[in-house]
Structure formats: C-alpha cells, structure tokens
Amino acid sequence: MTKLIVGLGNPGDKYFETKHNVGFMLVDKLCKDLNLKFTVDKIFQSEIASTFLNGEKIYFIKPTTFMNESGKAVHALLTYYGLEVEDLLVIYDDLDMEVGKIRLRAKGSAGGHNGIKSIIKHIGTQDFKRVKIGIGRPKEGMTVVHHVLGKFDRDDYITILNTLDKVDNAVNYYLQSGNFEQAMQKYNG
C-alpha cells in the first residue's frame, strides 16, 4: 500500500506560518520528525518527501500551486502513483472551528474551503480522508481573506503548536495502525 499525505497551504515566505498554512506546518513537522527532506517537483507542482513506514510507501506533499489550485497537484500525483482516493489524507485549516480544535473526517463537503473545493473538482469526489485544524473566525470588521492570510497572534500560535503535536500523533497513529476510523475515535474532540 501507498499513502499520499497532503498538507494544504500557499508557497513562499510571504505565507510562512499564516493561518491558511497550517496544513504545510503539519506536513513540515511530520517530515522533520522523520528526518525527511523535501524536493521540489515542477512537473507535479509540489514539494515531495517520502519514506517507508511498516512496509508502506508514504508520500508527504505540499502543493506549490497556491491553495485554490491544490486539486491539480493532488489529482496528478494520485494518477501518477496509481493511487485511489482511499489512499489520500488531506490536512488543512478550518475557520469555522475554534483555534486549535481538530476534526478527523472520512469524507465531507468543502465547507467553503477553496483548496478542498479544488481537490473535489479535480478528483471527482468528496469521499477522502481529511484532518481539519481550527483557526477561528475573523474578528469583527476583518475580511476572511485578511484573516486566513494573516499570522497567528502569540496566544493562538502557542495553541496551534500544541495542536500540531496532537495532529502529528493522530496522523502517525493512522499511518501505524492503518485504521482511520480508530484514529477518528481516539483524536476527535
């Protein structure tokens, strides 16, 4: 078996550690813990790192297409590696959840998230595993775009770092056990 673990975000220093980039932050953490280095693949418009865990090939992906076109990279990689949507796990921000909350889901709608909309459009289904990380709603008078492309304040950043540890554990549990349902039961909350 092979798995594709995709963190959503926007490439470039301008977007480093913004709220919209928590998917990138988590994939970076997973790869750092495993001592993996990313290589840029221009054909697949992604940064890619890979390893074997329990005899399974695992690809860690950060699309470089910008958030709203993430589906192009995800579809191309699924096709190239001959993978099914069952082999896909996407990690991304959710502004409808409180900062630091996580939710693992086996499938679901885009919920207004343009990166997820793009993936659904390109792979033709919303039936793929995902981990949502709460970034909270914009403060009164702030646009959604300004909010998601903004940095965390100090307290929220500390909360997110703790959350990334929890999500790291959840993803590793899934990769070790191969059982996403059990990971959902153990880590949702």
Swiss-Prot record:
Record site: Discriminates between blocked and unblocked aminoacyl-tRNA = 10
MF annotations from Gene Ontology: peptidyl-tRNA hydrolase activity; tRNA binding
Residues binding tRNA: 15, 66, 68, 114
Q: Which UniProt keywords apply?
A: Cytoplasm, Hydrolase, RNA-binding, tRNA-binding
Family, similarity comment? Belongs to the PTH family.
Q: What job does this protein perform?
A: Hydrolyzes ribosome-free peptidyl-tRNAs (with 1 or more amino acids incorporated), which drop off the ribosome during protein synthesis, or as a result of ribosome stalling. Catalyzes the release of premature peptidyl moieties from peptidyl-tRNA molecules trapped in stalled 50S ribosomal subunits, and thus maintains levels of free tRNAs and 50S ribosomes.
**Name of the molecule in the record:** Peptidyl-tRNA hydrolase
Naturally occurring in which organism (per UniProt): Streptococcus gordonii (strain Challis / ATCC 35105 / BCRC 15272 / CH1 / DL1 / V288)
- Gene behind the chain: pth
